[in-house]
Protein backbone atom coordinates (compact mmCIF):
# COMPACT_ATOMS: atom_id res chain seq x y z
CA UNK A 1 0.00 0.00 0.00
CA UNK A 2 1.34 3.42 -0.96
CA UNK A 3 1.69 5.98 1.84
CA UNK A 4 -1.00 8.67 1.91
CA UNK A 5 0.48 12.16 1.90
CA UNK A 6 -0.13 14.96 4.41
CA UNK A 7 -1.71 12.83 7.15
CA UNK A 8 -0.42 15.19 9.89
CA UNK A 9 -2.37 18.00 8.22
CA UNK A 10 -5.50 15.85 8.16
CA UNK A 11 -5.03 15.00 11.84
CA UNK A 12 -4.97 18.69 12.67
CA UNK A 13 -8.16 19.18 10.67
CA UNK A 14 -9.85 16.29 12.46
CA UNK A 15 -8.67 17.51 15.86
CA UNK A 16 -7.10 14.16 16.74
CA UNK A 17 -3.51 12.88 16.67
CA UNK A 18 -3.23 9.16 15.98
CA UNK A 19 -0.89 6.95 17.99
CA UNK A 20 -1.31 4.23 15.36
CA UNK A 21 -1.25 6.23 12.14
CA UNK A 22 -1.76 3.05 10.12
CA UNK A 23 -5.36 3.01 11.36
CA UNK A 24 -5.98 6.36 9.69
CA UNK A 25 -4.33 5.09 6.51
CA UNK A 26 -6.63 2.08 6.51
CA UNK A 27 -9.67 4.30 7.14
CA UNK A 28 -8.84 6.28 4.01
CA UNK A 29 -8.26 3.20 1.85
CA UNK A 30 -11.11 2.16 -0.45
CA UNK A 31 -11.63 -1.51 -1.22
CA UNK A 32 -10.68 -0.84 -4.85
CA UNK A 33 -7.13 0.03 -3.76
CA UNK A 34 -5.99 -2.71 -1.38
CA UNK A 35 -6.99 -5.86 0.48
CA UNK A 36 -6.71 -4.05 3.81
CA UNK A 37 -9.42 -1.48 3.22
CA UNK A 38 -11.81 0.55 5.36
CA UNK A 39 -15.06 -1.43 5.31
CA UNK A 40 -14.64 -3.05 8.73
CA UNK A 41 -13.70 0.29 10.26
CA UNK A 42 -16.75 1.80 8.57
CA UNK A 43 -18.96 -0.84 10.22
CA UNK A 44 -17.49 0.03 13.60
CA UNK A 45 -17.67 3.79 13.09
CA UNK A 46 -21.31 3.63 12.03
CA UNK A 47 -22.26 2.04 15.35
CA UNK A 48 -20.16 4.46 17.41
CA UNK A 49 -21.62 7.50 15.64
CA UNK A 50 -25.13 6.20 16.23
CA UNK A 51 -24.66 5.66 19.98
CA UNK A 52 -22.89 9.01 20.50
CA UNK A 53 -25.55 10.99 18.63
CA UNK A 54 -28.36 9.01 20.29
CA UNK A 55 -26.91 9.74 23.72
CA UNK A 56 -26.43 13.43 22.91
CA UNK A 57 -30.01 13.82 21.68
CA UNK A 58 -31.44 11.85 24.63
CA UNK A 59 -29.83 14.23 27.13
CA UNK A 60 -30.30 17.40 25.07
CA UNK A 61 -34.05 16.83 24.64
CA UNK A 62 -35.42 15.16 27.81
CA UNK A 63 -39.04 15.68 26.71
CA UNK A 64 -38.69 14.56 23.10
CA UNK A 65 -40.59 11.47 21.96
CA UNK A 66 -38.88 8.36 20.63
CA UNK A 67 -40.11 9.27 17.16
CA UNK A 68 -38.63 12.76 17.31
CA UNK A 69 -35.33 11.42 18.64
CA UNK A 70 -35.18 8.85 15.83
CA UNK A 71 -35.91 11.45 13.15
CA UNK A 72 -33.30 13.85 14.50
CA UNK A 73 -30.70 11.09 14.71
CA UNK A 74 -31.47 10.00 11.14
CA UNK A 75 -30.93 13.57 9.94
CA UNK A 76 -27.57 13.85 11.71
CA UNK A 77 -26.09 10.49 10.68
CA UNK A 78 -27.46 10.09 7.15
CA UNK A 79 -25.20 9.92 4.14
CA UNK A 80 -25.60 13.46 2.86
CA UNK A 81 -24.72 14.90 6.29
CA UNK A 82 -21.60 12.72 6.44
CA UNK A 83 -20.71 13.75 2.90
CA UNK A 84 -20.82 17.41 3.89
CA UNK A 85 -18.62 16.68 6.91
CA UNK A 86 -16.18 14.86 4.62
CA UNK A 87 -16.11 17.85 2.29
CA UNK A 88 -15.49 20.19 5.22
CA UNK A 89 -12.48 18.02 6.12
CA UNK A 90 -11.45 17.83 2.43
CA UNK A 91 -11.23 14.04 2.74
CA UNK A 92 -11.22 13.65 -1.03
CA UNK A 93 -7.65 14.95 -1.00
CA UNK A 94 -6.51 12.04 1.17
CA UNK A 95 -8.43 8.99 -0.10
CA UNK A 96 -6.49 6.02 -1.46
CA UNK A 97 -8.48 4.65 -4.41
CA UNK A 98 -7.90 2.03 -7.06
CA UNK A 99 -7.17 3.23 -10.62
CA UNK A 100 -10.76 2.69 -11.79
CA UNK A 101 -12.33 4.62 -8.93
CA UNK A 102 -9.74 7.36 -9.24
CA UNK A 103 -10.42 7.77 -12.95
CA UNK A 104 -14.20 7.91 -12.44
CA UNK A 105 -13.93 10.62 -9.77
CA UNK A 106 -14.40 8.40 -6.72
CA UNK A 107 -12.72 10.99 -4.50
CA UNK A 108 -15.86 13.12 -5.02
CA UNK A 109 -18.46 10.34 -4.76
CA UNK A 110 -20.72 10.94 -1.77
CA UNK A 111 -20.97 7.29 -0.71
CA UNK A 112 -17.18 6.91 -0.62
CA UNK A 113 -16.78 10.17 1.31
CA UNK A 114 -19.51 9.29 3.82
CA UNK A 115 -18.06 5.81 4.33
CA UNK A 116 -14.63 7.33 4.94
CA UNK A 117 -15.99 9.53 7.74
CA UNK A 118 -17.46 6.47 9.47
CA UNK A 119 -14.21 4.56 8.95
CA UNK A 120 -12.21 7.40 10.52
CA UNK A 121 -14.54 7.32 13.54
CA UNK A 122 -13.89 3.58 13.85
CA UNK A 123 -10.14 4.16 13.54
CA UNK A 124 -10.18 6.84 16.25
CA UNK A 125 -12.10 4.50 18.55
CA UNK A 126 -9.53 1.72 18.10
CA UNK A 127 -6.71 4.20 18.63
CA UNK A 128 -8.27 5.62 21.80
CA UNK A 129 -11.60 4.81 23.48
CA UNK A 130 -15.30 5.60 23.35
CA UNK A 131 -15.04 8.70 25.55
CA UNK A 132 -12.43 10.29 23.28
CA UNK A 133 -14.67 9.51 20.30
CA UNK A 134 -17.67 11.01 22.05
CA UNK A 135 -15.92 14.30 22.83
CA UNK A 136 -14.51 14.58 19.31
CA UNK A 137 -17.82 13.80 17.60
CA UNK A 138 -19.64 16.33 19.77
CA UNK A 139 -17.10 18.89 18.55
CA UNK A 140 -17.67 17.91 14.92
CA UNK A 141 -21.44 18.06 15.41
CA UNK A 142 -21.65 21.08 17.73
CA UNK A 143 -23.36 23.43 15.25
CA UNK A 144 -25.70 20.76 13.91
CA UNK A 145 -26.75 19.69 17.41
CA UNK A 146 -27.34 23.32 18.36
CA UNK A 147 -29.60 23.87 15.36
CA UNK A 148 -31.69 20.70 15.34
CA UNK A 149 -35.06 20.68 17.10
CA UNK A 150 -37.65 17.98 17.90
CA UNK A 151 -41.08 18.31 16.39
CA UNK A 152 -39.69 20.17 13.39
CA UNK A 153 -40.06 18.35 10.11
CA UNK A 154 -36.59 17.21 9.11
CA UNK A 155 -36.85 18.75 5.66
CA UNK A 156 -34.18 18.27 3.04
CA UNK A 157 -31.64 20.97 2.32
CA UNK A 158 -33.20 22.20 -0.94
CA UNK A 159 -36.57 22.72 0.74
CA UNK A 160 -34.99 24.51 3.70
CA UNK A 161 -32.96 26.78 1.43
CA UNK A 162 -36.00 27.62 -0.68
CA UNK A 163 -38.09 28.44 2.42
CA UNK A 164 -35.25 30.50 3.88
CA UNK A 165 -34.94 32.61 0.73
CA UNK A 166 -38.70 32.95 0.33
CA UNK A 167 -38.91 34.23 3.90
CA UNK A 168 -36.47 36.98 2.95
CA UNK A 169 -38.33 37.62 -0.33
CA UNK A 170 -35.18 36.70 -2.26
CA UNK A 171 -34.95 34.92 -5.64
CA UNK A 172 -34.85 31.13 -5.52
CA UNK A 173 -31.52 29.31 -5.98
CA UNK A 174 -30.33 28.37 -9.44
CA UNK A 175 -28.96 24.83 -9.87
CA UNK A 176 -26.90 23.94 -12.92
CA UNK A 177 -25.22 20.64 -13.82
CA UNK A 178 -21.71 21.68 -14.83
CA UNK A 179 -20.16 18.25 -15.27
CA UNK A 180 -21.09 14.56 -15.63
CA UNK A 181 -18.39 11.90 -15.49
CA UNK A 182 -18.36 8.13 -15.73
CA UNK A 183 -20.32 5.44 -17.56
CA UNK A 184 -24.11 5.57 -17.73
CA UNK A 185 -24.49 3.09 -14.85
CA UNK A 186 -21.89 4.77 -12.63
CA UNK A 187 -22.01 8.52 -13.14
CA UNK A 188 -20.80 11.38 -10.97
CA UNK A 189 -22.70 14.67 -11.20
CA UNK A 190 -21.24 18.07 -10.36
CA UNK A 191 -23.92 20.69 -9.67
CA UNK A 192 -23.41 24.41 -9.11
CA UNK A 193 -25.78 26.34 -6.85
CA UNK A 194 -25.99 30.12 -7.13
CA UNK A 195 -28.02 32.57 -5.06
CA UNK A 196 -28.26 36.35 -5.06
CA UNK A 197 -26.62 36.93 -1.66
CA UNK A 198 -23.47 34.90 -2.34
CA UNK A 199 -20.84 36.16 -4.75
CA UNK A 200 -19.31 32.69 -5.02
CA UNK A 201 -20.94 29.60 -6.44
CA UNK A 202 -21.15 26.44 -4.36
CA UNK A 203 -20.51 22.97 -5.78
CA UNK A 204 -22.13 19.65 -4.89
CA UNK A 205 -20.84 16.32 -6.22
CA UNK A 206 -22.78 13.06 -6.02
CA UNK A 207 -23.90 9.96 -7.91
CA UNK A 208 -27.17 11.63 -8.93
CA UNK A 209 -28.24 15.13 -9.86
CA UNK A 210 -30.73 15.26 -6.98
CA UNK A 211 -28.14 14.29 -4.37
CA UNK A 212 -25.62 16.75 -5.78
CA UNK A 213 -28.21 19.53 -5.57
CA UNK A 214 -28.96 18.59 -1.95
CA UNK A 215 -25.28 18.69 -1.02
CA UNK A 216 -24.82 22.09 -2.68
CA UNK A 217 -27.97 23.46 -1.01
CA UNK A 218 -26.80 22.28 2.42
CA UNK A 219 -23.47 24.04 1.97
CA UNK A 220 -25.20 27.27 0.88
CA UNK A 221 -27.39 27.14 4.00
CA UNK A 222 -24.33 26.78 6.21
CA UNK A 223 -22.66 29.76 4.52
CA UNK A 224 -25.77 31.92 4.91
CA UNK A 225 -26.05 31.14 8.61
CA UNK A 226 -22.45 32.06 9.42
Curated annotation (Swiss-Prot):
S-S bonds: none
Gene Ontology molecular functions: double-stranded RNA binding; metal ion binding; ribonuclease III activity; rRNA binding
Residues covered by the DRBM domain: 156-226
Annotated active site: 46, 118
Positions that bind Mg(2+): 42, 115, 118
Signal peptide span: none
InterPro entries: dsRBD_dom, RNase_III, RNase_III_dom, RNase_III_sf
PROSITE patterns hit by this protein: DS_RBD, RNASE_3_1, RNASE_3_2
Chemical reaction(s) catalysed: Endonucleolytic cleavage to 5'-phosphomonoester
Recorded GO CC terms: cytoplasm
Similarity-based family: Belongs to the ribonuclease III family.
Function according to Swiss-Prot or TrEMBL: Digests double-stranded RNA. Involved in the processing of primary rRNA transcript to yield the immediate precursors to the large and small rRNAs (23S and 16S). Processes some mRNAs, and tRNAs when they are encoded in the rRNA operon. Processes pre-crRNA and tracrRNA of type II CRISPR loci if present in the organism.
Name the record gives this protein: Ribonuclease 3
The species this protein was found in: Shewanella sp. (strain W3-18-1)
